[in-house]
Amino acid sequence: CLMPWSTAYGNVMLGVKNVYPHASRAERSQIVESALSSVGLADSMEKYPREMSGGMQQRVGIARAIALKPKLLLLDEPFGRLDSLTRMELQDVMLDILNREQITTMLVSHDVDEVVFLCDRVVMMTNGPAATIGEILTIDFERPRDRSTMLQDPLYFRCLDHLVSFLT
């Protein structure tokens, strides 16, 4: 959730100030600008959330997270509110950032295409309030991943079929 009274730059800086309190103003500014540039928002740093599309707002959230250089990043349905094209574009951006920054990520998602594209392992949960781990599926695609190459590989569809059959 973005702070509506703050620009994209300010929203990212909010966390950076707290995580890097001893960094100089110039160093913190460089961290923020680099994070926003990495998600394609170099020209939108001074925009407020009300001036941004849902996809742009999601990019600011991603920039805010990666600017903090976490060892573990938890993403809970990060692309759920987005249209299909924006979702795919942001998945590509996210995958590029995670590969480059080497951030371990735990992704919660109900989108089987998304988990096959982004994840190395899928932990499938059983139904119900007392849910447990039902099965773990390893996704054996090389990194860096390319969506068009994966879509031509029979392994991609075997993984999808396996996930869907577990869910049904």
Spans of model-derived segments:
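Catalytic Walker B motif of ABC-type/P-loop ATPase nucleotide-binding domains
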Residues: 73-76
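Conserved H-loop
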Residues: 102-108
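Conserved ABC ATPase "signature" region
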Residues: 13, 17-20, 24-44, 96
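Conserved signature/switch motifs of ABC ATPase nucleotide-binding domains
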Residues: 47-50, 68
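Short coil-to-helix segment of the ABC ATPase nucleotide-binding domain corresponding to the Q-loop/switch region
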Residues: 6-15, 116
